[in-house]
Design a protein with these regions (language model features):
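Gram-negative bacterial Sec-dependent N-terminal signal peptides
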Residues: 1-33
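Predominantly soluble domains enriched in secretory-pathway, periplasmic, or organellar proteins
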Residues: 26-382
Length: 382
């Protein structure tokens, strides 16, 4: 296979504290293939040359996750700047200019620490209903906002812990209209929220090792009527039927060293029949992307990336895989063709690369958080 294309990285780089300097990194990268292989060469061979640079643009405090609306060509970002939730919002961003068009005024709630914002962490787009779903992780709730008005239309905030619809520590959410559910990761369970009734059904996975607390990973994937769930504690990928909620299969993730793998995100390339799984590992060991046969789940290869590989997405048209490294703040680029190798690492803004998404035109939008640096901001009280 030969590849001739031009790619663009667009990164939203931002501070992790309430008054930290924020920015957006636009990273143009070109991947140019060699001419068609000679007759003596394999038709699957390709050589990719890459060039990359970063351009920084203003972002949001504490960005955690990013989502994309194909219908409106808008980028959505959820962010909470500090653990005390003094700053939290969701933003709608023009995908072409990366300019912030609007931000939501999140509700202020009362808890044992006083009055704080309803903290936004995970986010996904529902273009069928014209909404965005947000996980309020540290507040143990889910909220839905109108894409146009940014007004909250539904939330689980305020329900009792004894309520069967209560979800503990919701982290990632994904809407699937084929099954009529919104799937939410959290502590102990994956929850399926009925899109019409908003009733919750808990999906039980295999128990965590040694009876410990299970931490479902940040991202999940729905593909072909199956829900793919990375489970960080036990290092497994669970494959769940989206209609019956039955676990059809599971497989262990692999790294390049002894110890925990801690899978975090997952993508499938049907043209290569491969599953890609990012893993954070521990202290730099097992950080990278592992590759599996999409049919048999047989382990094929591990590609080391950075020191804490986190989010992952793939460009199936060009067989490219992108992975954010929270440890180094870089975005790794993997040739997902026959070579299955790391071909580039693109630096962002010196922060911690958190999440990313591939757009239909092949651009990549990545968000990061600054590493705790603060700034003095002049202001006047009215």
């Amino acid at each position: 296979m030969n590849l001739a294309s031009s790619k663009v990285f667009k990164g939203l780089a931002v501070g992790s504290l309430a008054l930290a300097i924020s920015g957006v990194a636009t990273i143009p990268a070109s991947f140019a293939a060699d001419p068609a292989p000679a007759a003596s060469q394999s038709s699957d061979a390709r050589t990719i040359a890459d060039k990359a640079m970063a351009k920084i643009t203003q972002g949001l405090p504490g960005q955690f996750q990013v989502a994309y609306s194909k219908k409106t060509n808008k980028i959505w970002v959820a962010g909470t700047a500090d653990r005390d939730k003094h700053v939290s919002t969701i933003a709608r961003i023009d995908a072409n200019s990366l300019k912030i068009e609007a931000v939501a005024e999140l509700p202020i709630i009362k808890n044992d620490k006083g009055y704080q914002y309803d903290a936004a962490y995970g986010i996904t787009v529902d273009d069928v209903d014209g909404t965005v779903w947000v996980t309020n992780t540290t507040d143990n709730s889910i909220s839905v906002y109108d894409q146009e008005t940014l007004q909250q239309t539904w939330t689980t905030a305020g329900i009792a812990e004894t309520d069967p619809n209560w979800i503990e520590h919701p982290r990632s959410v994904l809407v699937d209209h084929e099954s009529g559910k919104a799937f939410v990761t959290g502590r102990f369970f994956v929850s399926a929220i009925d899109l019409k009734t908003k009733q919750v059904e808990k999906i039980q996975l295999e128990g965590a090792p040694d009876g410990g607390t299970r931490y479902i990973s940040m991202n999940i994937l729905v593909d072909g009527g199956k829900l793919y769930v990375p489970e960080r504690t036990g290092g497994k990928i669970f494959v769940v039927d989206t209609k019956t909620f039955k676990v059809e299969s599971s497989f262990d993730t692999k790294g390049n060293a002894e110890g925990e793998v801690r899978p975090s995100d997952i993508a499938i390339d049907h043209s290569q029949n491969e599953i890609y799984v990012s893993s954070q590992g521990v202290k730099g060991a097992n950080s990278g992307v592992s590759i599996y046969d999409a049919t048999t789940h047989e382990f094929k290869k591990f590609i080391p990336v950075g020191t804490q590989a986190l989010a992952l997405d793939n460009d199936e048209d060009n067989d490219l895989v992108y992975v954010s490294d929270f440890g180094t703040g870089k975005v790794g680029v993997i040739d997902g063709g026959a070579a299955d190798k790391l071909i580039a690492e693109v630096a962002m803004n010196g922060g911690k690369a958190n999440d990313l998404v591939v757009l239909p035109n092949g651009s990549v939008v990545a968000v990061d958080k600054q590493a705790g640096a603060t700034a003095t901001v002049p202001y006047v009280l009215d």
